[in-house]
């Protein structure tokens, strides 16, 4: 309502014509009452310490008062003042002053017009271009690594297995005692038979201590050819051809040892490995041959074997493969054979440069960058997250490599050209052209970088246009070769690089990723610093020009901002005179809230800046002035302006601003709500982007495994094939040898030849005893054998009984036969017969018919002759019986000795004298 009343009072003439008279009178009465109330308020000037709310309320009250005064066109007591020259000293009361804020950095001060020091602004600043001068070229990069995979080639081994098998036999079982295998090399003359006809001989000989020992297949004692057939066992790397799949063994006699021989020709087609520098090679079985696989008898390749056992055959004819008689043949330009004690090894000799390559392609980078540093080149690949560092010395891939008699890079040159052409046609054919020739560099990590530079077609056309118009165009790619001047002639020099220390080169690829990380960080930091330096220089240049021009308007403020402290300055021609400002008593400063100028109660003009009253330090005199920028007090109150309608002014004091509406204080405004004029030059710095490193595998697991010439897998597989090839005897020979026999055999063999012979004898006896015992035990445990044994026991008991009952008939069988009559020496009839010498006289009676009656004398009476015999007589009788037994046995022996052989006719004629005797006449069944 007060603002409406104020506007109504200011335009009363126009408003009276358009509104009713009653409203005009009511406004005048209201304004008069407010002016009287304000004039009656007494005032002193205390140190006001009101907050923002009280100040706002005071401002609203005083706004209404000033409006009423204006309406009545009367001078208000607040504007009663005295004029001293051009300075108006205002009257101050507690409702029209306020305390300033933020005087720490910019205290209240008075800057004098008199200056003593002279300063000036410099000339225009020249900004240096900080663009890096590092030449950069884009292109195609192919990276090659050292080939660590071993050279693998085919090797044929020839040997004969002389297999000796020993066994022992008793009555029921054959015992297998063991096998010994002797490997013997093929003689060189027999290799032709094997390689050309797929046959080998069945005999083998060996010289031991100057003696020749010969072994024959199946103990045949014949030397004939046998056909090679493929063995049942095979592997990925080896094929075996043999002549004997089943082993022969001759059974032993009972209680005897036997040993048989099998001759097996074995041809193995296998693989061998050799790695740089190719001084030896290793077979899949683990055999090491100290000869370079490329030694041909004329070159300087390593050779450490016995030359007497080494042969090289030129244009050698042999089978393409073994196992078939009808297999085709081939001609080998160079075939090498090495004879050892246990085998003969053969392999084909190839030129080294045709079958080996020291380098292998690792990565193809279609978009690569080459930067030229002071000491070398950096080949950067963002796709690989790697940087390869190389010297500027190029490698000539068209010349012979130092230390070798051939060019080691020719094997990769064609591949590189093909790869570069493929990438160029696929990605760059429409936009780029090739820049320069193919270049080769050796990196610090032992890699080979093949580089093909590229150039955009637009730049290429610009260079061609400049060349036609004799205008030089600076390119980013510097010359890659150095030149020396001799006698006015430019001579290009290139030094060969030695690869003798190739083994000392570190092949770890992690260094390349570390180098890439460093290059990325370096480029990022350098770009940021370059942007900062450029922005800083441009800002300094602009600021200097602006300050120079602004100093012509307000030199004090400009220099205060430059020196960051309050100073006073004024122009003195083309220079500036500067001096320090004088501080005032900070607690005595009062800022008035009303900026209007009244005369006779009427607003006649307005101050352009707020009024200030203050006191100097150590002074009690009240001074007046106007508030300048940053709390500067400008002496005098002559800075006025015409009052504007709807005026709004904000005066900055520290971090806040005093807001005046229609030249009267309204409130304290925070500067945060007032937008700043953006004079900051943008700093082009972006956060470092994330880089995920790729896992670069320079050599795969397969390559690392293949680089080792000793392949454990192949050696074990070859060993297993040998193990499976050893078979036991067939069912004819049972391996159930008792442990004690094996132990005894081992013990006796350890004693030498004599012990071996003793062992054979002991083994025979022990084996016989063991066989008998085992036979008896087996016979008794058999039912039939047990029954037979019982019958035999019964028979033996019967015989014993008969012997016991008839001892004379058993012991003296001839006593029951018809005896020859003994005639007495004196005649046919005599007294007592004369018996054997020393025998007692025997009485014999002879009948008239010539019959003997003596038997009756012994048998007629059971008591016999009534005669008593002494022990001496019994002894004489036993002796006589012994003599009689001996004479009978001798007689039978003489009859057998004198008996002539008789045939069937003699037997029929009756001339057989085989022991038959004619019966006596009295005993004959025939009558005469």
UniProtKB/Swiss-Prot annotation:
Site feature: Cleavage: 497-498
InterPro entries, A to Z: Glycoprot_B_PH1, Glycoprot_B_PH2, Glycoprot_B_PH2_sf, Glycoprotein_B_ecto_C, Herpes_Glycoprot_B
Residue ranges with Low complexity bias: 51-70
Compartments (UniProt record): Virion membrane; Host cell membrane; Host endosome membrane; Host Golgi apparatus membrane
Residue ranges, compositional bias (Basic and acidic residues): 853-863
Ranges facing Virion surface side: 38-783
Gene Ontology cellular component list: host cell endosome membrane; host cell Golgi membrane; host cell plasma membrane; membrane; viral envelope; virion membrane
Span of the signal peptide: 1-37
Membrane topology: Single-pass type I membrane protein
Physiological role: Envelope glycoprotein that forms spikes at the surface of virion envelope. Essential for the initial attachment to heparan sulfate moieties of the host cell surface proteoglycans. Involved in fusion of viral and cellular membranes leading to virus entry into the host cell. Following initial binding to its host receptors, membrane fusion is mediated by the fusion machinery composed at least of gB and the heterodimer gH/gL. May be involved in the fusion between the virion envelope and the outer nuclear membrane during virion egress.
Protein name as catalogued: Envelope glycoprotein B
Native source organism of the sequence: Murid herpesvirus 1 (strain Smith)
Lineage of origin: Viruses, Duplodnaviria, Heunggongvirae, Peploviricota, Herviviricetes
